[in-house]
């Protein structure tokens, strides 16, 4: 099946066996953005959203998302995460919010899925908390920006084509 590791020779989905892989420090950084109306951005920036501290709640949700990734992605290994750091960057020019998540573990498989899930859950929480005033918000540009560790080595998005 041409390099797709989640399928066996017969084409059936399976969880990849990582038992023989060496344990190493694994780090992944993912990023995403939510665009919104200027008035919605002002509510978040000024801490005046009716549901409370939007970014504070979204930060906790993102951490929870990283921890629950294996429950959501069927073939993803459950991992003992050693660190999840969530940062939000307010962007007046957009207007919107960028979410950057760094996830770390010491194990046999990477944490890219945990970082991506954390970004999505954090941004979905922003949407949920602000949808009463702005149903047109758009979550966009969610991607892995960097990964470190493991057999395949280090990688940065700027190293990729496209």
UniProtKB/Swiss-Prot annotation:
The active site is at residue 128. It catalyses: (8S)-3',8-cyclo-7,8-dihydroguanosine 5'-triphosphate = cyclic pyranopterin phosphate + diphosphate. InterPro entries: MoaC, MoaC_bact/euk, MoaC_sf, MoCo_biosynth_MoaA/MoaC, Mopterin_CF_biosynth-C_dom. Keywords: Lyase, Molybdenum cofactor biosynthesis. Substrate binds at residues 75-77, 113-114. SUPFAM superfamilies: Molybdenum cofactor biosynthesis protein C, MoaC. It is an enzyme of class 4 (lyase). Belongs to the MoaC family. Catalyzes the conversion of (8S)-3',8-cyclo-7,8-dihydroguanosine 5'-triphosphate to cyclic pyranopterin monophosphate (cPMP). This is Cyclic pyranopterin monophosphate synthase. The lineage of its organism: Bacteria, Pseudomonadati, Pseudomonadota, Betaproteobacteria, Burkholderiales.
